Amino acid sequence: MKLTCALIITVLFLSITADDSRGKQGYRALKSIAGMLNSKTVRECREQSQGCTNTSPPCCSGLRCSGQSQGGVCISN
């Protein structure tokens, strides 16, 4: 009888704690990857001395991309 009661209490405790943790800790790696991707797309233009290519965001105003074909750099006009 004591074992049955202890088992029921344990199952109830585990079911209560399982509901509390739901959705708080899932897929941390995916969240961090999504955060990194979003941080790269927020930037609208490349600053001076940053790399630039045909597919990257354009250089900021007053700058131009020098040497795009070989992995260019944003420099002053």
From Swiss-Prot:
GO terms for cellular component: extracellular region. Keywords: Disulfide bond, Knottin, Neurotoxin, Secreted, Signal, Toxin. Disulfide bonds join 45-60, 52-65, 59-74. One of its GO terms (molecular function) is ion channel inhibitor activity. Residues 1-19 form the signal peptide. It holds the Pfam family Conotoxin. The keyword Secreted applies. It is found in: Secreted. Residues 20-43 form a propeptide. Expressed by the venom duct. Its main location: secreted. The presence of a 'disulfide through disulfide knot' structurally defines this protein as a knottin. Belongs to the conotoxin O1 superfamily. This is Conotoxin CaHr91. It comes from Conus capitaneus (Captain cone). The lineage of its organism: Eukaryota, Metazoa, Spiralia, Lophotrochozoa, Mollusca.
